[in-house]
Amino acid sequence: MAASCMLRSSFISPGLPQLHHQSTSKPNNGIHFFTPIKATATNDAISQQKHRRPADENIREEARRHCSSHNFSARYVPFNAGPNSDEWYSLDEIVYRSRSGGLLDVQHDMDALKKFDGQYWRSLFDSRVGKTTWPYGSGVWSKKEWVLPEIDSDDIVSAFEGNSNLFWAERFGKQFLGMTDLWVKHCGISHTGSFKDLGMTVLVSQVNRLRKMHKPVVGVGCASTGDTSAALSAYCASAGIPSIVFLPANKISMAQLVQPIANGAFVLSIDTDFDGCMQLIREVTAELPIYLANSLNSLRLEGQKTAAIEILQQFDWEVPEWVIVPGGNLGNIYAFYKGFQMCKELGLVDRIPRLVCAQAANANPLYLHYKSGWKDFKPVKANTTFASAIQIGDPVSIDRAVFALQQCNGIVEEATEEELMDAMAQADSTGMFICPHTGVALTALFKLRNSGVIAPTDRTVVVSTAHGLKFTQSKIDYHSKEIKDMECRFANPPVEVKADFGSVMDVLKSYLLSQNSKL
């Protein structure tokens, strides 16, 4: 039986319904949950006084004070193993591949989770939204039972990541796509500015646990196209764990490069591409006690899957028709599938959305594989793309991505450099400020709308994976029309004008007339 901390205060929410046990059998005596009470104005005030943390007690001490136990568990198993496979590993083992050399997956004890019905889990997750109780203020750790159920809350390394904005892209959807129900899940609104935080909080928390268990881990390393290294270095710095980063020289933005440097990572700028860096970090972690943080390590996907759960939660547990995800190393498309599928299997929803994986045409091995009918996957040499984080020609999670897309009748699309930059500029013109990777996803949406695959009324979610502020140079180049062989149709360069009233008025009148003609 594993110990875990369930904070009493996180289960109390005004008007929250009672949580009922679904199973008719006797509950396991090792499971102890606090049942939410329906709060009134009076008992809510009493509750706030009762659960206020004493002045001399820190947030982790409060978590320990309200500690209880459960019998949920998880383990590593070979990815997509058959029912007769008996191979498995504890999450406390340092292992990245199965005996046959294949990928691993984190398998949860679904029988234990199914002892509680969908209404229970919906109410539990909803009751934690907006709380500061440790660690449930995090959008990842608010689903702790589904992520790393056996880790002690004292070992968790979190910046309360997740809980990212899901907003209605009304003007963009109506003006450019004729859509009325288009949404953007902005995972870039996070601690280090990308969705990688969701996975890194899980991985670094487990490393923190392993180091306390005196496992041979002297640091954590990754190959990166920018965002992974930013997340790794930040979370390792928070826990006082050394981080080692392999970056392809001159292939990431300065904003991405400065993040691991600022957070104290040991950064190696290597004269190769991401695939070359990935090969080197694999070889290094096989020889040195450095924990591998790339998505070959399936722990990260446990955190990333919570974005899918969060989308359902933000829609009041209604399922959208489509979710479009940019894809490079391809772990995220599988993570989204896994999150949606867990919600279906545990009764929170009755179906899952169709997934679309969007790739840059300059790095499109999954797209080519999809167009061939999933026959004979071949890596490609990734060419330079403005969507630098997905400039990957030999994705680690290809098998995971294919499985996910086949299970949900998914689609793969691609975007040329001009298409993705135009889409980014169009989105920005309606009040967004997106990254080029989101431009790839929006291009996929344009194509699927134009072909009639996605209907104008289909509820569709585009996953924005990073913050646009990481990619300002690409936006400057576009609006300055300085990109070779690109028309930059939606560029909006500044207008140079003399410093006198008449010149300014002439320019303004011309601008206002042009705007009026568009009405």
Swiss-Prot record:
Modulation of this protein's activity: Allosterically activated by S-adenosyl-methionine (SAM).
Q: Which cofactor does it need?
A: pyridoxal 5'-phosphate
- Extract the InterPro entries matched here: Cys_Synth/Cystath_Beta-Synth, Ser/Thr_deHydtase_PyrdxlP-BS, Thr_synthase-like, TrpB-like_PALP, TrpB-like_PALP_sf
Organelle targeting sequence: 1-40
Alphabetized GO MF terms: pyridoxal phosphate binding; threonine synthase activity
* GO CC annotations, alphabetized: chloroplast; cytoplasm
- Where is this chain's protein located in or outside the cell? Plastid, Chloroplast
Give the residues the record marks as binding pyridoxal 5'-phosphate. 328-332, 465
Quickly give the catalysed reaction.
O-phospho-L-homoserine + H2O = L-threonine + phosphate
User: Per the UniProt record, which EC number(s) apply here?
Assistant: 4.2.3.1
Q: Just give the chief location class.
A: plastid
Q: State the CDD domains in the record.
A: Thr-synth_1 (cd01563)
Superkingdom per UniProt: Eukaryota
Q: Name one GO biological process term.
A: threonine biosynthetic process
Q: In which pathway does it act?
A: Amino-acid biosynthesis; L-threonine biosynthesis; L-threonine from L-aspartate: step 5/5
PROSITE patterns from the xrefs? DEHYDRATASE_SER_THR (PS00165)
Summarize subunit and interaction data from the UniProt record for this chain. Homodimer.
Task: Give the family per the record.
Answer: Belongs to the threonine synthase family.
Function description: Catalyzes the gamma-elimination of phosphate from L-phosphohomoserine and the beta-addition of water to produce L-threonine.
Q: Which protein, by its recorded name, is this?
A: Threonine synthase, chloroplastic
Source lineage: Eukaryota, Viridiplantae, Streptophyta, Embryophyta, Tracheophyta
